[in-house]
């Protein structure tokens, strides 16, 4: 069996090696010729999987190591009898930790205001549960849910009136609830003074031109963008206006990536009728030094902020993206290639649950907060 896989998917050989011959290729430039002789195709969100890529190929199974599936032409795949699978929830924890890291970098105490979430699926739902467990006043907009599923559901207008807004919707262009440009000029005008807007879902859910126009006059609004419209050739003007910008890496924790690979491996084995041999728990490398320094802090908010910054310095992601923009503006590089380079060579970021915190007796009040965030308190 021949397997073609995106070169940026970790542990592909370790998981899929016993199933067949593996060819690893750049996902964004994958062509029909590249996959013509493949039986299995393993991709990420940068590879559009449709008739143009697969018509005339031998591919019978497509796996995407991502939560989102807007890059798959699902109707065409099903029409052709090509099985496909995604990895829902694989990097939800990673994205939620990105949101917390962004708030810490902006020095935003999330208890001091109302928090709005747009899209309460795997990612938004996890963020919702963590915030509620910390005592945050949360409002959610998701037309696909009922009040029985989430008692804090409300209108989009009510969510847009919150102090902090985090967006986690898939990109949907058809059906009853399309999300393309869900937040545009009219919605941005509803943001309250001093609002924080985070988009770590899909770039085109926010009208990026309307957002740029808004930020040019609304200097009180601070925006965090991990996803852009379009990618990889994002608006450098918009990058200059946002408080934090990153190259679509919110879900790029090493743990999240490995979860995605493992989920697609399991689905592939099931599809071809082979018993799985690889086990994620045996492949994940342990951290050598996972005890964090509390710096003598004892109160929940200052201690949480200090620990999060130790584990994940989101400012470094922002700085690397802006450095690529400066190189492009100086004519020393092509920005789109630089954007992809940052994603391909992203540092190994481990999630909070890999780290231990030794609490003093004076810091016991912070135990619940830190446990909700995922840290292991000892």
Swiss-Prot record:
Binding site for NAD(+): 142, 169, 226, 251
GO cellular component terms listed in the entry, alphabetical order: cytosol
Subcellular location: Cytoplasm
Principal location listed in the UniProt entry: cytoplasm
Pfam short name (any one): 2-Hacid_dh
InterPro entries: D-isomer_2_OHA_DH_cat_dom (IPR006139), D-isomer_DH_CS (IPR029753), D-isomer_DH_NAD-bd (IPR006140), Erythronate-4-P_DHase (IPR020921), Erythronate-4-P_DHase_dimer (IPR024531), NAD(P)-bd_dom_sf (IPR036291), PdxB_dimer_sf (IPR038251)
Binding site for substrate: 45, 66, 252
CDD domains hit by this protein: ErythrP_dh
Assigned protein family: Belongs to the D-isomer specific 2-hydroxyacid dehydrogenase family. PdxB subfamily.
Protein name per UniProt: Erythronate-4-phosphate dehydrogenase
Lineage of origin: Bacteria, Pseudomonadati, Pseudomonadota, Gammaproteobacteria, Cellvibrionales
Gene responsible for this protein: pdxB
């Amino acid at each position: 069996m021949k397997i073609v896989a995106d070169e940026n998917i970790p542990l592909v050989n370790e998981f899929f090696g016993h199933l067949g011959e593996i060819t690893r290729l750049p996902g964004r430039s994958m062509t029909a010729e590249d996959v013509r002789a493949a039986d299995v195709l393993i991709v990420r969100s940068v590879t559009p999987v449709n008739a143009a890529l697969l018509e005339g190929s031998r591919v019978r199974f497509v796996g995407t190591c991502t939560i989102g599936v807007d890059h798959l032409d699902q109707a065409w795949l099903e029409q052709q009898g090509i099985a496909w699978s995604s990895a829902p929830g694989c990097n939800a924890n990673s994205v939620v930790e990105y949101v917390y890291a962004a708030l810490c970098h902006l020095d935003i105490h999330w208890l001091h205001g109302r928090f709005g979430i747009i899209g309460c699926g795997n990612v938004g739902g996890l963020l919702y549960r963590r915030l509620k467990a910390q005592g945050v006043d949360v409002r959610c907009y998701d037309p696909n849910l009922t009040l029985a599923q989430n008692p804090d559901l409300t209108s989009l207008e009510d969510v847009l009136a919150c102090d902090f807004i985090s967006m986690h919707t898939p990109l949907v262009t058809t059906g009853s609830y399309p999300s393309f440009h869900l937040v545009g000029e009219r919605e941005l005008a509803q943001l309250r003074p001093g609002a924080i807007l985070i988009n770590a879902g899909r770039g085109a859910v926010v009208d990026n031109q309307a957002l740029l126009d808004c930020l040019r006059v609304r200097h009180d609004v601070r925006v965090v963008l991990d996803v852009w419209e379009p990618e990889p050739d994002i608006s450098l003007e918009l990058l200059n206006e946002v408080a934090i910008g990153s190259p679509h890496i919110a879900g790029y924790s090493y743990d999240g990536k490995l979860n995605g690979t493992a989920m697609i491996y399991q689905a592939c084995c099931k599809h071809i009728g082979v018993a799985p041999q690889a086990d994620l728990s045996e492949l994940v490398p342990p951290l050598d030094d996972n005890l964090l320094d509390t710096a003598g802090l004892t109160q929940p908010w200052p201690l949480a902020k200090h620990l999060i910054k130790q584990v994940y310095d989101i400012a470094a992601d922002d700085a690397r993206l802006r450095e690529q923009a400066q190189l492009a503006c100086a004519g020393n590089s092509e920005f789109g290639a630089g954007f992809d380079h940052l994603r391909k060579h992203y540092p190994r970021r481990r999630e909070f649950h890999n780290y231990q915190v030794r609490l003093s007796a004076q810091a016991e009040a912070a135990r619940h907060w830190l446990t909700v965030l995922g840290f292991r308190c000892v």
